[in-house]
Amino acid sequence: GGTDGPGWIPMSAVAAVALLAAVLLLGGGDRRELGSPPPGGARIEVLDVGQGDAILLRPDAVDPVLVDGGPPGGDIEGALDSAGVDDLSAVLLTHEHLDHFGGIFDVLGRYDPDRLLYDQAPPDLLSAARSAGTVPVRISQGDTIGFGDLEMEILWPPADAAAVTDDDPNSHSIVGLLEWRRFRMLLTGDAEAGMAPLDPGPLDVLKVAHHGSDDTGLPGLLARTSPRLAVIPVGEGNTYGHPDASTLDDLGAAGSRILRTDEDGTVSIVLGDGPPRVETGR
């Protein structure tokens, strides 16, 4: 964020593990247990689910919210289990691409989310949600959603779908500004800055859109927002060339620290008393 934003305490995986004291490996996998949200605080987990997006919002004392579910076979259940999730209060789908909604089918029956928040969603997912007792709720620009002490303002897309002239589903992706006290993080889905006119003000964290693909609008967004940390959910050895070298260059030139799930594993932002803290899974 701006110069008056919270300071950062970067943590290596080793330091994070030492702080948590007890580290458990789940049977059959290499996911470590994620810590609990601080009392009165929250954790934001950018989950390592391969080539796809899944972000877990974990406010203290209320059931968490899952933003996207990653691709089919991305082990979203293992990721949620590593966070000790039993139930979800909601799942938010940013847009109807398989690497964002594929894992949601696995989530619906097991974690019993109350609501599926969406702007555009495949009919079979809406049907599966209703069958599981999850209520689909349409959201769009101007809506504000509270999750415990976390609040998300929906910045994109407009309620009038005709206002989005691009047919690419990415251009309809939900973009949300996540706030907790003075902490501010932009969740972009796959809406590249060149597609969605965004001016959210200073940011602490940017979730980089579309797995770090080339984005001509990114330098302008970075100039307007000055994020201290940029997190890229991306699959190791993916065939798309993500993240693009130009995106990494733009982020570096803006002075943003870069973390990426293919190299760093799950990226956790811990919000409590004192400055936000960052933990990585590797």
Predicted regions and their residues:
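Non-globular, low-confidence helical/coil segments that flank catalytic cores
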Residues: 1-282
